[in-house]
């Protein structure tokens, strides 16, 4: 397995980006974003220059998953492995790198045509991160940006791509029945975070099921839940604790695009 990757950023296309701006400010309490030439906005959740990017467009969907490599050598190795396996990996130009706030970037599609951006050198912001909504901040750093859960129609092919080619390890697997629907899932890690990526075979019109931000304190999670209720956001799952070995105490609610977000704390490292 290569040196640890980390989830660097997520890019969302939104039909109504103004709703996302209110969500980022009112729900997540994030500082004012950077505004790019194409109209996209880059939002901070820590010392990095941006972690969540919202770009205006005709669809509500996950436009890209950004994965940061340890260094340029690891990036080149991953690109070579992908190309040898028949995947078309293309280098991002200077304009895209500037937009993503990284030094170098290659992009490739996973087996279900989801865009993955492999990068190095995510820029740090000039000022410390501060949020009145999350005064204790979020757990990021070497663990990267929380996690993202993707909907996978072909779970085996997606596991082979993210595991066999990108080097994610399987933390645990899940099989459950929700009414008439049989759900299978695979939780995958690329560093000490329990999972930075999960793949779920379930009915959905979205590529993404949810993304998660890990708060540093339970107090901030509780206040976030109260804030979600006061803002009238649909609550998908009430406050509760995941079973071991994850152990996260969290809740799930809906983003302005209709897929979910999770705010949690006390996730166990592996």
Positions of PLM-derived features:
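N-terminal beta-strand motif that seeds the catalytic metal site of vicinal oxygen chelate
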Residues: 1-18, 62-67, 123-156, 169-171, ...
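Core segments of cupin and vicinal oxygen chelate
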Residues: 2-50, 150-194
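Short, structured motif recognition centered on aromatic/hydrophobic residues
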Residues: 6-10, 24, 30, 52-54, ...
């Amino acid at each position: 397995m290569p040196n640890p990757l980390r989830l660097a950023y997520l890019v969302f296309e939104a039909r109504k980006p103004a709703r996302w701006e209110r969500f980022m400010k009112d729900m997540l309490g994030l500082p004012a974003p950077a505004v790019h030439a194409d109209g996209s906005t880059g939002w901070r959740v820590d010392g990095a220059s941006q972690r969540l990017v919202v770009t205006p467009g005709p669809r509500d969907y996950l436009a890209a998953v950004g994965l940061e490599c340890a260094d340029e050598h690891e990036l080149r190795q991953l690109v070579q492995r992908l190309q040898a396996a028949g995947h078309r990996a293309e280098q991002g130009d200077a304009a895209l790198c500037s937009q993503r706030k990284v030094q170098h970037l290659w992009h490739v599609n996973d087996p279900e045509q989801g865009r993955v951006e492999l990068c190095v050198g995510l820029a740090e912001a000039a000022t410390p991160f501060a949020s009145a909504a999350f005064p204790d901040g979020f757990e990021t750093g070497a663990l990267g940006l929380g996690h993202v859960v993707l909907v996978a129609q072909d779970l085996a092919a997606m596991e082979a791509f993210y595991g066999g080619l990108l080097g994610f390890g399987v933390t645990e697997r899940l099989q459950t029945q929700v009414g008439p629907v049989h759900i299978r899932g695979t939780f995958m890690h690329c560093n000490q975070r329990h999972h930075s990526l999960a793949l779920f075979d379930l009915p959905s019109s979205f590529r993404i099921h949810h993304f998660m931000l890990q708060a540093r304190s339970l107090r901030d999670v509780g206040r976030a839940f109260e804030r979600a209720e006061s803002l009238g956001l649909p609550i998908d799952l009430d406050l509760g604790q995941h079973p071991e070995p994850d152990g996260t105490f969290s809740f799930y609610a809906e983003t302005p695009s209709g897929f979910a977000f999770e705010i949690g704390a006390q996730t166990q490292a592996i």
